[in-house]
Amino acid sequence: MIDLSFLTEEEQEAIMKVLQRDAALKRAEEERVRHLPEKVKDDQQLKNMSGQWFYEAKAKRHRDRIHGADIIRVSMRKKRPQVADEQSKDRANRAKESWVNNVHKDAFLPPELTGVVEEPEEDVAPASPSSSVVNPVSTMIDASQENTRKSAISPAKPRKNPFNSSMLPEDHLSQQTKNEQSKNGKTGLFQTSKEGELSESKEESSILDISSQKLEKPKQTLPGPESGFPIKAPVPKPRKMIYKSQDLKQDDNQPFPRQRTDSLTTRGAPRGILKRNSSSSSTDSETVRFHQNFEPKSKIVSLGLTIHERISEKEHSLEDDSPSNSLEPLKHVRFSAVKDELPQSSGLVHGREVGEFSVLESDRLKNGTEDAGLTDEVWNDPQPSQYTNGLPFQSSASSPSPSKNETSQPTTSGSFPINEHPSSKEFLTTRAQSTENSHTINEHKTSSSELSKNPADELSCTEPESSQVPDCSSRDHQQGSEEEPSPVLKILERSAARKMPSKSLEDISSDSSNQAKVDNLPEELVRSAEDDQKADQEPDTNECIPGISTVSSQPDNQFSHPDKLKRMSKSVPAFLQDESDDRETDTASEGSYQLSRHKKSPSSLTNLSSNSGMTSLSSVSGSVMSVYSGDFGNLEVKGSIQFAIDYVDSLKELHVFVAQCKDLAAADIKKQRSDPYVKTYLLPDKGKMGKKKTLVVKKTLNPVYNEILRYKINKQILKTQKLNLSVWHRDTFKRNSFLGEVELDLETWDWDNKQNKQLKWYPLKRKTAPVPLEAENRGEMKLALQYVPEPVPGKKLPTTGEVHIWVKECLDLPLLRGSHLNSFVKCTILPDTSRKSRQKTRAVGKTTNPVFNHTMVYDGFRPEDLTEACVELTVWDHYKLTNQFLGGLRIGFGTGKSYGTEVDWMDSTSEEVALWEKMVKSPNTWIEAILPLRMLLIAKISK
């Protein structure tokens, strides 16, 4: 069933016309099918022509026979849940009416059950005024739908009720049972849930009597079928718990939200006003959890081990305990982990019912402790737990925002105490069930509570006020599926929801103070739930997370530290651009290159972060970067790798058997360990097709792989290739650091020598010089440049100009994927490699001579900046999710220096230098040229 409560009456009428048309078509189709046996004698042909095969296949696949028209028709009867204001107005209106209407004052049916008492429609007599009170929306629609619904039911293929088969009165209960229920004054709408709650407690007989008296009148409002015998309302799944009418009267004057200090003399727990606004698809999931929590005592006692397992599963998915001022709790049943405390009522949390949670539910402890059960590391609490006696109550409901000390007292992993007093005796059955299994539960919970860490040690950066806004990601995923999500999914959702800090290459900064801070911190950011919450907190001024680049609060002149600028000019991998260099992440039209502002910004060349990207990045991304660039980071290359290669003629495959590595460099200097993996290429195939990788072996310098990497390739082609094996460290943010490589020339390899098929140790080496590629295979680019000085005299700020780059077309681009090519051009003004400064053209496919005719504009240029900057134009072949580098240009003065520091990207050729000089000398004039594309080689760091 779908949620159509938002539709207006006009829209509902339009849909009803469509449904009526559908019913008419069904009648015509049924008439045609009825006459088919007279014309068609073959059973198989008759089955195909009548459409019977389709309904049988659908029933086998979906296990039901519900039709789309029925789903829409029933969904339109769904009633929008009332909010607090509407419900209070309805109470006042009903109080002025007859006693019959006042009986229903607290029987607020959920939208999933709306209209149940009026089924079946085709047998319903004209509704009485009292029945319209139960569901005014559905009775208004029934008049226009009655004839349509009668004719829409196919006699040959009866359709089941979309709610549930148990809702039809004739499915499971005999007529005798219905009459007995009518005599007793109890309808099926409430009987199931009442029996589930009161089956084990004799003290609840008074409550049952009150409910029976209350429900005698609603029974009379149910219209009987035309045959004359009384009917019982269909029995829904036991999802909600109905309370006594006295509760709402008492709570009308109480503060909202409900206080935790409800006394034991309270007659009943009020129903939560704000219900879960979910579609009916989540109704089944709530029903499942309802059955888990409120099964009969005898069944639960016999399955003690099952209870233990269920609570263990819940423990990994429970969030922090809801705050006192939240309207409704989370959906989970919470038990106390303390052995000297019996678990309180599991049916009520904060005096509300199971299955509800507030629309305004807030993750109040966003900066507090997370569930330590989700982590792989054990954090021991050096101090005795402060939660052995439960959390203190909040005695005031007038202050919606708790104090800082109250915020810093969440329940930790494994202990979920229920501290509020039981507000009713209605749920003693559940408490009895919990008590009998408390030994097993408490043992499990106590062992789990040892994993928790003192929250006082974690909340050093807690903000003074916690958020009142609901956590959409956690709430939505609670609404969704029938099963609780796994701990892995919870970690992924939290890590995706929080703001991910930027991470740079390890030890890239020359600032020794930052390195000292790095060494004093834990590393496993993702695997620790404690660090998950720390990522949401404001960072401590005395420490920083390893690998997270910190920016000084005061602007730092980038020229005061030439050594830093040298390091920035060193080759670093393109994973600072998310490694894939996807086109979707680039800025297509922004072109603000404010050099004067850039030189004074904290995110200048002195700050190497993944967002600013102020490094000498090559234009080769991802896989190609590992082939055509220098060393990544400043990790020492050492150790060796053991592998063997063989060509299997029968399979026409090259097999690379990677055995192990030893004595690798430690990417984590403090713990002296790395997370290495091996990556292989067949050069010069630089794309994804030529790359193979092993699994990542965690926390070792001597990894053992024993994996075979296979290449499907002809032997003659293989003899023209080179095999490149490189070892990489993969950190927790999935960024790579180079640990060494080995390269074999397969052209001179002796494939017949058996010694070459044996495992051998090869020492790891630094990156070799990139493979030279023929310039004539790169193609050419036709472009024009123009420098426009800013003609705005009289401004206080120095005037700045613009550089216009007109990319016209490319000629004779190489084909790396056979006959397929989908090229585009990307432009960057070095030394700024941030995403905001990058622009690109559209992709032109199916041609080696693409015409772009795209102009890119960069502003903020002063005359002196023209001698220090360089325009980098790169051509890419876009294929699925990857971009393959084709060639590029670097247009500048080619001095090898930028702002007084030697850099490797200032390597323009004579033709490129000539074009740049003409542009500078001839402002406001387009300077055209056709330049050959080249492989942008990355030089080593300058000393």
UniProtKB/Swiss-Prot annotation:
Residues 77-99, 118-291, 361-613 are annotated as: Disordered. It comes from the Eukaryota. Residues 1-57 form the RabBD domain. PANTHER family: BITESIZE, ISOFORM I, SYNAPTOTAGMIN-LIKE PROTEIN 2. Monomer. Binds NRXN1. Binds RAB27A that has been activated by GTP-binding via its N-terminus. Interacts with RAB27B. This is Synaptotagmin-like protein 2. It is found in: Cell membrane. Residues 82-99, 194-205, 524-537 have a biased composition (Basic and acidic residues). May act as a RAB27A effector protein and play a role in cytotoxic granule exocytosis in lymphocytes. SUPFAM superfamilies: C2 domain (Calcium/lipid-binding domain, CaLB). One of its GO terms (molecular function) is neurexin family protein binding. Pfam families: C2, FYVE_2. The RabBD domain mediates interaction with RAB27A. It comes from Bos taurus (Bovine).
